[in-house]
Amino acid sequence: MGMTMTQKILAAHASLDSVKAGDLIMADLDMVLANDITGPVAINVFGTIDKEKVFDKDKIALVPDHFAPAKDIKSAQQCKQVRCFACDQEITNYFEIGEMGIEHALLPEKGLVAAGDVVIGADSHTCTYGALGAFSTGVGSTDMAVGMATGKAWFKVPAALRFNLTGTLNKNVSGKDLILHIIGMIGVDGALYRSMEFTGPGVACLSMDDRFTISNMAIEAGGKNGIFPVDDQTISYMEEHGSGDYKVYAADADAVYEKTFDIDLSQLKSTVAFPHLPENTKTVDAIEEPVTIDQVVIGSCTNGRFEDLKRAADILRGKHVKKGVRMLVIPATHKIYLDAMEAGYLREFIEAGATISTPTCGPCLGGYMGILAEGERCVSTTNRNFVGRMGHVDSEVYLASPEVAAASAILGRIATPDEL
């Protein structure tokens, strides 16, 4: 019986010839990650472990991004605790204000994750790095602490779902529409503790930024991880970002999948997830009554990358955000910020009536920089739209692609670029 891509990576890191779904293993870790919310909890737990130093100061990443720059005294204290721990432990990959970014955009950009790696992070969207052909998954702060101390973590080997992609995406349809389509199709628990393995000729038409978006939201279907095969695009990205040594794992021809979903990318349309779950999806052309909005957010670890900003800027160029609508643009890292500035996109956003933020998770988790009031509606390129996720419990969040978000900002209602 063959192994999936995920199972091969886990077997190698557990020094086993093979594994199967349901096996319990102890695996070596290539990177352990935390932020300013989960980091302090992990640091407190680390203090109770009989270890004075982390297992490898080069394999820990600490990124203050959720409430950074600090929004209040409490968040400042949390950032300080992470900062002091990083200093005491001489953590190589601690990223301070001015060099930080949203963690799941920053680590690939810095070359800290490569194909074949095993990565855990005390953040549920750590599954993002599957876009690079790595096994990455979110864990609790206790597992994070043990990972920092030992360089190991235990896993139950996941069963797998295969998503066989064919065709190519149409204009103004992107990876966000694909993952929303999938979550709408299988539900928020449709991939519960499964690896979501994306295969097929359609993968080649997906950019790296599209793949990051798709892997990022695997957790919104309950997935343990979401992983893409390594191809020329992946290798070019890793070489460009100095990812260092990598190893390519490919699924066996007789790998076992619980189910295969065939998806023709050319049939996908602009898709939005209605409140209050990512599975509540509709194609925009199926929305019967106009959904007017108060705010648009383009950013986050899901859609704050350069290509996302380019797509939005191309739509906004020469147009203006509708009066009464607030539009926030949040580049995911400082490099993306600079690249967008040099490309002229930030000027175009500002001239269109948007405001630009320093890199931060901010409004995505209802932290700050764009909190919603009672009764307000927001179209957001983020990844969750739970009750109260971005503010008041009686506010509403609609998840969408950068293309739909930009068009909606212009028209003041959920719309596609085709309507402009």
Curated annotation (Swiss-Prot):
Pathway: Cofactor degradation; nicotinate degradation; propanoate and pyruvate from 6-hydroxynicotinate: step 7/8. It catalyses: (2R,3S)-2,3-dimethylmalate = dimethylmaleate + H2O. GO terms for biological process: L-leucine biosynthetic process; nicotinate catabolic process. Keywords: 4Fe-4S, Iron, Iron-sulfur, Lyase, Metal-binding. InterPro entries: Acnase/IPM_dHydase_lsu_aba_1/3, Acoase/IPM_deHydtase_lsu_aba, Aconitase_4Fe-4S_BS, Aconitase_4Fe-4S_dom, HAcnase/IPMdehydase_lsu_prok, Homoacnase/IPMdehydase_lsu, IPM_dehydratase_rel_enz, IPMI_cat. Highly active between pH 6.5 and 9.0. Retains 50% and 10% of maximum activity at pH 5.0 and 4.5, respectively. Heterodimer of a large and a small subunit. Belongs to the aconitase/IPM isomerase family. LeuC type 2 subfamily. This is 2,3-dimethylmalate dehydratase large subunit. The lineage of its organism: Bacteria, Bacillati, Bacillota, Clostridia, Eubacteriales.
